[in-house]
Amino acid sequence: MSVVSQVILQADDQLRYPTSGELKGIQAFLTTGAQRIRIAETLAENEKKIVDQAQKQLFKKHPEYRAPGGNAYGQRQYNQCLRDYGWYLRLVTYGVLAGNKEPIETTGLIGVKEMYNSLNVPVPGMVDAVTVLKDAALGLLSAEDANETAPYFDYIIQFMS
């Protein structure tokens, strides 16, 4: 939920107008809109490149994942890993656009550790996967945009750790 929606819902729940501080928060959110859109466009337009670079780094670090018996062994499992990379990149993009981490949590993180555990996917490997995805994505952004984006990746990494 965006900052604007949060302020409106909170004020409405309390039967009041938004406070001056809340309105300043909305103003700050709106002034960063162009940056958030620029980041989202860069991530979306470069998804394939980011995912490709990240998977190369992960499987270089953990070649056992692609070996027989590994979680990314075989084309089907490998494609599922790449699909998950794209999914996590989209989650970060949703957070950046909303200006907060709520879309990441509500759209994608509830139950994710349990799901991976039930599928015998090593959660530390997924943490490594999101870490290399972060590195690949931030490498395409300016320093300012990378600083804005990094906390969304960090939130996922911390949640899964």
From Swiss-Prot:
Light-harvesting photosynthetic bile pigment-protein from the phycobiliprotein complex. Allophycocyanin has a maximum absorption at approximately 654 nanometers. Heterohexamer of two alpha chains, one alpha-B chain and three beta chains. One of its GO terms (cellular component) is plasma membrane-derived thylakoid membrane. The modification N4-methylasparagine is found at N71. Disruption phenotype: Increased levels of phycobilisomes (PBS) and photosystem I (PSI), decreased levels of photosystem II (PSII) per cell. Cells are unable to undergo state transitions. When combined with an ApcF deletion mutant the cells have decreased PBS, PSI and PSII, and require glucose to grow. InterPro entries: Globin-like_sf, Phycobilisome_asu/bsu, Phycobilisome_asu/bsu_sf. The lineage of its organism: Bacteria, Bacillati, Cyanobacteriota, Cyanophyceae, Synechococcales. Keywords: Antenna complex, Bile pigment, Chromophore, Electron transport, Membrane, Methylation, Photosynthesis, Phycobilisome, Thylakoid, Transport. This is Allophycocyanin subunit alpha-B. Belongs to the phycobiliprotein family.
